[in-house]
Amino acid sequence: MFEQRVNSDVLTVSTVNSQDQVTQKPLRDSVKQALKNYFAQLNGQDVSDLYELVLAEVEQPLLDMVMQYTRGNQTRAALMMGINRGTLRKKLKKYGMN
């Protein structure tokens, strides 16, 4: 589950361990760990378009959740994300979310 702390601009990821303890860590830590895992699996192979890969992994759920939060209101969603409405529409189309 993703949450944003009210008093900061840090997105956090909440996890529950086997003792039902909830811990939170910044989303960036989860991204960093995912990249470490990805690089470990490469075994020295070259990779291209890593930026696009990571961006797509974050951008699609971001768009999905913002559109749910705004109940499909693209104007509100674009304002919330700080992007132009036309840019939002282009991104929604890219991921088949239009």
From Swiss-Prot:
According to the record's subunit comment, the protein's assembly and interactions are:
Homodimer.
Describe the family membership recorded for this protein in Swiss-Prot or TrEMBL: Belongs to the transcriptional regulatory Fis family.
Q: What does this protein do?
A: Activates ribosomal RNA transcription. Plays a direct role in upstream activation of rRNA promoters.
Annotation: DNA-binding region: 74-93
- Note one Pfam family from the annotation: HTH_8
Looking at the keywords, is Kinase present? no
Q: What is the lineage of its organism?
A: Bacteria, Pseudomonadati, Pseudomonadota, Gammaproteobacteria, Enterobacterales
Name of the featured protein: DNA-binding protein Fis
Q: Which keywords belong to this entry?
A: Activator, DNA-binding, Transcription, Transcription regulation
SUPFAM superfamilies, per the entry: Homeodomain-like
Please give the Gene Ontology molecular function terms for this protein. DNA-binding transcription factor activity; sequence-specific DNA binding
